[in-house]
Amino acid sequence: MTGPGTNTYLIASGRDCVVLDPGPPEESHRRAIIAAIGNLRLRGVVVTHTHPDHAPLADPLAAEFGVHTYGYAPGPGFSPSRRLRDGDRLRFGEAVLTAVHTPGHTADHLCYRMGGTVFTGDHIIGGSTVLVEDMGEYFRSLDRIRALRPGRLLPGHGSRMDNAAEAIAAYIAHRREREAQILRAVGDGARTVAGVVEAVYEEVDPRLRFAAAGSALAHLRHLADQGKISLEYGEGTGDEPWEIAAVREAAVS
Ligand SMILES: [Zn+2]
């Protein structure tokens, strides 16, 4: 699920630095980060969200250097010693890193802005789309980052994006297109998550079907929130906990 791996950033200003998203607790990776810090003064360990490929090395690394960890909220394998809220600023050297709360991929997701650069974690990644827990929040968070008018994006996976406006516009367009496809699939008679995935995500690797189902469900909930369809939540069996009960609006093309 991590594509080419997780990106860890060492952000330096003068002699001071912070580490952003140190990653999983792998010894070789820990040694590589410490080698990169070298003679710099580590001032803190910053985390975008608590997924296991981003955060678990944060607490042990910070303990080793006697510095704080920063993040939105505790989660599996990570408990920030300083909790950040939207707009909170971290100063080190001449640099200021500003937390931007961007729920959607996860509820606890923070991006970090530094001048014209935004560190986007798993909100926007290079060369792929991301899994989304809450689509309404996710759309709002994309608008939020677009409104900052960043020049470049440095993601948690994949390559840097030097044309941020283009990358954000492509993300928003992709999500709108996906949602229109799903609404059409419901209009055409799909009544379960599996049915929607079948109709819309034809090309998906069978091993990633659970991920497609998660995204489809997030879109369906968003469509229901907008009053375009209604969902019926039953007892269900884990991966199929509900049915689409009714289409309130004819599918539009
Ligand atoms: Zn993630």
Language-model regions: role of each:
Residues 26-27, 50-56, 76-77, 106-109, ...:
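Active-site environment of divalent metal-dependent phosphoester hydrolases
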Residues 11, 21, 49, 84, ...:
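Divalent metal-coordination and catalytic microenvironments
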Residues 26-70:
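Active-site metal-binding motif and surrounding structural segment of the metallo-beta-lactamase
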